[in-house]
């Protein structure tokens, strides 16, 4: 059975971009693959965090994963920092990577632009991501468009390490959802919907009440010509809504576009579709968070399962590179 790995940061409250671009696909994958999913709390440390808030957000993010339908009896769900092999392998891969290829990472360029002080962790972030993936002999990685470059680096590092020290890592492949791989901000459709960027009207959080969802969709930026047409280059706001509608309803982009001749009805139906789709997820979230010990208990169980695999991979890599056995 193929193994699938993916992760989500605990840098803020999960939103519909996370759900349609990742969580929902993960739920489907768990039935057909050996699935490993991770709340990557170490990655959140690339920027300064409030300790109490980070702990809270890590638990919140994990709770939404379970509420979305991930079954801890079928797949593995854990917090990255609970499995120390992630940082252990990251160092071996940092010594395999070059400064030049890390400088070419688009996300580093974007996130460091205009900043007077940038953490070294932000620079080496893609290497830790590579360690996350390679630790689990991963075959497939569900990624958004913005993570493809990091996955290519992961593949390059695996091939390079294998070439130097013998076959050690499985070289993973990317899987990108055909629809809603990258949900954009409702107010700034030129940028991705984000947990870490403050945009109250631009982000639909999974916890949002129905009326809040309706209001955000109603106020979503479109354009002035009034023609319902899917055209991401010239009509990014409307095209984002069409993609989101297609993802939420299971319809094609062409079908959604052909069904409307005005923006108002499209927005209204999209809002109601989102409310309907998110309602059972929100109900499960309320149920699981009613027991404050439930999520920590499930994460501990997942970390034990993940650690059993990760320890073997790190041991193999250490031996290959020439380190003494502890």
PLM regions: where:
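N-terminal Rossmann-like or analogous alpha/beta NTP/dinucleotide-binding catalytic cores
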Residues: 2-131, 276, 286
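Short catalytic-loop micro-motif centered on adjacent basic/acidic residues
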Residues: 76-79, 142, 225
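Short, polar/flexible loop-turn hinges at active-site or ligand-entry regions and domain interfaces
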Residues: 50-51, 140-144, 228
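Conserved nucleotide- and phosphate/pyrophosphate-binding catalytic cores
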Residues: 18, 149, 155-326
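Short helix-capping/linker segments at secondary-structure and domain boundaries
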Residues: 99-103, 135-142, 246-256, 282
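Short, histidine-centered active-site or binding-site loop motifs used for metal coordination
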Residues: 8-10, 41-43, 139-140, 197, ...
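Internal, conserved structured core segments that host functional sites
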Residues: 112-161, 165, 185
């Amino acid at each position: 059975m193929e193994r699938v790995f993916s992760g989500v940061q605990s840098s803020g409250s999960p939103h519909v971009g996370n759900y349609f671009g990742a969580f929902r696909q993960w739920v489907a994958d768990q039935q057909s693959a050996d699935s490993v999913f991770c709340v990557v709390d170490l990655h959140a440390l690339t920027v300064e965090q409030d300790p109490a808030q980070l702990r809270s957000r890590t638990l919140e993010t994990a709770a939404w994963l379970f509420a979305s339908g991930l079954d801890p009896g079928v797949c593995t769900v854990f917090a990255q920092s609970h499995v120390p092999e992630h940082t252990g392998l990251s160092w071996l891969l940092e010594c395999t990577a070059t400064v030049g290829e890390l400088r070419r990472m688009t996300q580093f360029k974007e996130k460091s632009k205009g900043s007077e002080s940038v953490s070294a962790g932000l620079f080496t972030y893609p290497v830790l991501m590579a360690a996350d993936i390679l630790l689990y002999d991963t075959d497939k990685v569900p990624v958004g468009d913005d993570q493809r470059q990091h996955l290519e680096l992961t593949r390059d590092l695996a091939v390079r390490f294998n070439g130097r020290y013998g076959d050690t890592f499985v070289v993973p492949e990317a899987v990108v959802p055909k629809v809603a791989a990258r949900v954009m901000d409702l107010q700034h459709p030129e940028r991705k919907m984000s947990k870490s960027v403050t945009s109250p009207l631009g982000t639909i959080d999974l916890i949002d009440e129905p009326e809040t969802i309706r209001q955000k969709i109603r106020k979503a930026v479109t354009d002035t010509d009034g023609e319902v047409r899917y055209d991401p280059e010239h009509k990014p706001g409307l095209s984002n809504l069409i993609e989101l509608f297609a993802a939420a309803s299971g319809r094609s982009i062409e079908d959604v576009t052909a069904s409307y001749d005005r923006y108002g009805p499209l927005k209204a139906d999209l809002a109601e579709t989102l409310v309907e789709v998110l309602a059972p997820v929100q109900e499960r979230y309320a149920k699981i968070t009613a027991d404050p010990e439930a999520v920590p208990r499930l994460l501990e169980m997942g970390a034990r399962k993940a650690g059993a695999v990760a320890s073997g991979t790190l041991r193999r890599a250490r031996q290959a590179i020439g380190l003494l056995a502890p």
